[in-house]
Regions:
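Bacterial N-terminal signal peptides that target proteins for export
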Residues: 2-10
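C-terminal motif of bacterial Sec signal peptides marking the signal peptidase cleavage site
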Residues: 19-22
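Transmembrane signal-anchor/signal-peptide helices with a preference for the extracytoplasmic
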Residues: 24-29
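Polar/charged, Gly/Pro-rich intrinsically disordered segments
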Residues: 32-46, 55, 62-72, 92-127
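N-terminal secretory signal peptides
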Residues: 49-50
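Short amphipathic alpha-helices in soluble, non-transmembrane regions
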Residues: 74-81
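Short catalytic/binding micro-motifs of nucleotide second-messenger systems
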Residues: 85-89
Length: 127
């Protein structure tokens, strides 16, 4: 009887461990490649000079604009960047696993910063 209980609890423990570790693992994707493709997309189709990078769990993306945007325009551009990276990563839950730091430069100055932490909404601030 004790041996059966021990075996039962061991099996339950192992199943729980597998389920928990499977749920917390980021999806298999190359986020660095998605960032690179997004960079190319904005340069070629939108004519926006930009640079992107991926470091551990944070995507960093800088856009250099020729005209100064409003806060609303900056927010729209940032959302376009997020959607494009998500599209190229082939995972609609990308932002449940990665943080994002964005900024917009105009005339050699950073004028807007955007941050989006895992599972949170995008926050845009003027500098």
């Amino acid at each position: 009887l004790i041996k059966r209980k021990s075996t039962f609890f061991l099996v339950i423990y192992l199943i729980s461990l597998i389920i928990i570790s499977g749920c917390n693992k980021p999806p298999e994707q190359d986020i660095g490649e998605a960032v690179s493709k997004t960079e190319d997309y904005f340069k070629k189709s939108k004519g926006i000079d930009c640079v992107g990078a991926f470091d551990d769990d944070t995507v960093k993306f800088r856009l250099l604009l020729e005209e100064q945007p409003t806060v609303e325009e900056a927010t729209k551009i940032y959302n376009d960047v997020l959607k494009t990276i998500e599209k190229y990563s082939n995972n609609e839950k990308t932002w449940d696993y990665y943080n994002v730091k964005l900024d917009i430069g105009y005339k050699n100055n950073i004028i807007f910063k955007g941050t989006k932490d895992v599972g949170e909404k995008l926050i845009v601030k003027s500098k």
